[in-house]
Design a protein with these regions (language model features):
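Extracytoplasmic cell-surface/polysaccharide-interacting catalytic and binding patches
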Residues: 1-46, 143-151
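Catalytic cores and adjacent binding grooves of peptidoglycan-active enzymes
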Residues: 86-151
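Glycine-rich, flexible loop/turn motifs
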Residues: 2, 64, 73, 105, ...
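Catalytic micro-motifs at enzyme active sites that drive phosphoryl/nucleotidyl and oxygen chemistry
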Residues: 69-74, 109-113
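Amphipathic alpha-helical interface surfaces
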Residues: 37-41, 51, 64, 80, ...
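Structural recognition of the beta-strand scaffold that forms the well-ordered cores
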Residues: 54-56, 81-85, 123-125
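Acidic, His- and aromatic-enriched active-site or binding-groove loops in soluble protein domains
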Residues: 72-94
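Extended, low-complexity, intrinsically disordered C-terminal regulatory tails
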Residues: 40-69
Length: 151
């Protein structure tokens, strides 16, 4: 188990990896990073939400990240980032974003697309107490390209 509420399978699951036969297994350092992110961000968030939270993406090996067109600098590849979604839980993505911003330490958090009221999902990363930047961004499309602005 990665944490009380995240199984090893859930932390590495990807339909793309399964479909393409890609090995999406983290090494020990990546797994330690995943456990730290779960401890510092996911579990406190889940306790506040009061129930399950959908994880759209957690760990991505390099092959998987390349297959989905992810950034070469993606913290998902280090086990330091996850994308969470309110699908089925009793809080909105916007509420989860605000809770993380106001109550938790994090490295980077992204309001992923959506509109000004609610993102489609929330990207959040955690590095370490000393290295976290508490950086908040908003992702948007401009002429078909994803861009980010500080919020």
């Amino acid at each position: 188990m990665i944490s009380k509420h995240i199984s090893d399978r859930e932390g590495v699951y990807s339909t793309t990896a399964t479909r393409r036969g890609l090995d999406n297994t983290p090494d020990s350092e990546q797994l330690d990073n995943m456990k730290l992110l779960a401890e510092k961000v996911f579990e406190p968030l889940r306790e506040w939400v009061g129930g399950p939270i959908r994880i759209n993406s957690f760990f991505r090996g390099e092959e998987l990240n390349e297959a989905i067109g992810g950034s070469s600098k993606s913290q998902h590849c280090k086990g330091q980032a996850m994308d969470v979604d309110d699908g089925g839980c009793n809080k909105t993505n916007a509420e989860m974003y605000r809770f993380i911003k106001d109550e938790l330490e994090f490295d980077q958090m992204i309001w992923e697309f959506g509109d000004d009221k609610n993102p489609n999902w929330v990207h959040v990363s955690y590095v370490s107490e000393d290295e976290n930047r508490n950086r908040c961004l908003k992702a948007y499309k401009d002429k078909g390209k994803t861009k980010y602005m500080v919020i």
